[in-house]
Amino acid sequence: MKKTLALVLSLVLLLTAATAMAATEINYWSVFTGGDGAIMQGMVDAFNASQDEVIVNHTPMTADDLYQKVPLAVQTGSGIPDVCVVHIERIPNFVNQELLYSYDLDLVAEAGIKQENYNQAAWVKSTIDDEQYGIPLDVHGYITYINKDLFDKYGLNEILADGYITFDEVKWAGDKAKEQGFTGKTFDLGWQRAQLLGYYAQLAEGHKLTDDGIAPSLDKEAMKKAMETMKELYEQGYTSSKTDDYSSMFYGGEMLIWSEGIWMKAAVVDAGVNFEMYPAVCFDPANAKSWMSSHNFVQFADEERTEEEDLAVAKFVNFMGENSLVWAKDAGQVPAHVSLNEVAEFASMPQAFLADPAREDELAIYYYLHWGLFDTAISRVNWDFVDGTIAIDDAIAQIEKEVADAIAAQ
């Protein structure tokens, strides 16, 4: 009997070991740190616990670190992660440098990944020359928060009836609240690059940054109007100033309307603000657009990666999409997997309007080969064009020149 029991235990141990050996191990790098990093780690842990075929090792780091380390790993052929999360704007340049592999859509379909399962505004932006280089985890961007208690107090709710807030309505709300004794600010100028690109997208057809795909070429009249609108709001006293802590002002009831990222929702909740979310402030509700981005799963080039590992990655990515409710709830993001649209808990979240397929044309996701250079150039003129340090025409010319010079220097 003892020999039989020992034999059975030995077989169980052997089978357990064989199962563990059969698991495919993949390395995953992400740009999520801090609170988002902890939430992402929890999602990875949930995947690992859900099955025994794939083990995912998650390495979080800042976006800047990842964008420096991964190309170096590809060049040396050493330490290349099997899957990464990157911002969608970076994908065209990675493809141009031949740093990314496209997905085998037949293979990933075996794991459940299909185009129709995803937010189309995000999916198509990572389709290049009919090849799919990214699978979106989410869409996220710069929208509008309002302090509902202040709106109730000062009788401002009529401007919310259609679900949009225009620039004229911002001024109307500020004037009406001030007439009743409100001493705070109406609106903020915060991360101006994100605000400006949302407003520009409402005016420039296709929110173009280039004509030929390479050289910078802005719609100058559209950019000028967007900049002039921000400058006018500042000069007329409706907005926060350069030195203001605009977030604290909103948390403390000293601001009516706050332009911020959806990822700040948890902080607003923690501050105890009774709030609602709307699209970015617009010129015309018929053409409302908000600057948006998307975290995408990509696979950097690695000749040693096997088909088995590619399938393991696909299983992981599909799980993350189907189980991204926590990403919406705790990280404040908008899952790109459309199955979440049918989940009542998500539908009740304030950012859920960004997932509405009928409103995908309101998501201004930018696509430009030299996005990194453009991002640096447009960010450099923040506040300068608002406070008059630089003339608006000169600011626009400076953006284009800086990008063109940087391209020429490569």
Segments predicted by a language model, with ranges:
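Extracytoplasmic/periplasmic substrate-recognition and gating elements
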Residues: A49, Y154, E228, E235-Y238, ...
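Glycine-centered hinge/linker elements that transmit conformational signals in sensory
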Residues: K171-K176, D212-K242
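Extracytoplasmic "Venus flytrap"/periplasmic binding protein-like
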Residues: A46, S50-Y118, K153-G155, L256-I257, ...
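Long, aromatic- and glycine/proline-rich binding clefts that accommodate carbohydrate-like moieties
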Residues: Y278, K329-D384, Q410
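Hinge/lid segment of periplasmic solute-binding proteins
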Residues: H87-I143, D168-K171, N274-P279, E345-S348, ...
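Periplasmic solute-binding protein
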Residues: E89-L99, Q120-L160, L189-D212, W291-A301, ...
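Short, polar/charged alpha-helical segment
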Residues: T33-I55, I378, I396
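Short, well-ordered beta-strand elements
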Residues: A23-T33, V54-T59, D82-V83, Y133
